[in-house]
Amino acid sequence: MGYVKNDSEIVGGYSLIPVIHDVDSIESLKGKINCCDLKIDSGMNRLGFNSPTEIACAIKLLEEYNVKMRAVCTHFYSKESILEQLDKFNRLIAPLKGVKIHCSATTGVLGGYLFDEVRVGMLAYGFGSLDVKPSMIITSNVLAIHNLKVGDVAGYDGIIKCNNPTKIAIVSGGYYDGIDKVLGEYVIVKEKYCKVLPSICMDMFYVDVTGIDVKVGEKVEIFSKRLADKDNVIRPYKQMTAIKGRAKRIYHYQ
């Protein structure tokens, strides 16, 4: 996220290094910082300086306010356009000497564009095409189990209709927790892929566990590398960031 002017006191108070993307940000941080990174817009048209004139103006202000430019950066928006973006980026930063460069998120790193620093996202969590160990998993537990007969229904408006004898598990987690954005087609219960049924509630959801010896309290794997791979989720940002504050976070240090 780019620097927000209302946060100038926080940036200065904690000696943070802001990424500056416009001249107004430099003005608002006058006297509060001694170092910054400069964001260059190389084609995404989101944040950043995109002309030599703008960059020259920024450098003049930084020098006037005695602020060191630590690094310049951009953001690759498409692996197919990296070379085109690099060409524009290199032309814009040509006058700048002795500063670090960081441009690459996971896609750029996998393409070999490393520069001085990198900004990996999903790769740090074990997602992507490299053979790396996943470091994030979302799990829940079975709250209840029901054996339904042919003709039985379940869920709001009876959306789940049983054409065959069906064993369902009610699993903790719902809209309130962001589960609706996390769930794919399957979850894993006792190392078996189980179909998620089409009814998510505020605090729980339904899973078909027919033929599996499942007990109340059983762990349910809701999101993981293997589930993302099975559902063919290539860029699982939405799932990785969707879970809200009520869910318990457990950190393992190795």
How would you name each of these model-derived features?
Residues 4, 45, 50, 123, ...:
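Gly/Ser/Thr-rich beta-alpha loop segments that engage phosphate groups in nucleotides
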Residues 1-2, 16-21, 100-104, 118-120, ...:
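Short, hydrophobic beta-strand segments that form beta-sheet elements in well-ordered domains
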Residues 1-30, 80, 109:
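N-terminal active-site wall of soluble small-molecule enzyme domains
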Residues 17-18, 101, 115-117, 135, ...:
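A residue-level structural signature of the nucleotidyltransferase/glycosyltransferase Rossmann-like core
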Residues 27, 32-35, 40-150, 211:
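Active-site loop/helix belt of alpha/beta enzymes
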Residues 20-23, 52, 83-86, 132, ...:
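Electropositive phosphate-/nucleotide-binding environments in soluble metabolic enzymes
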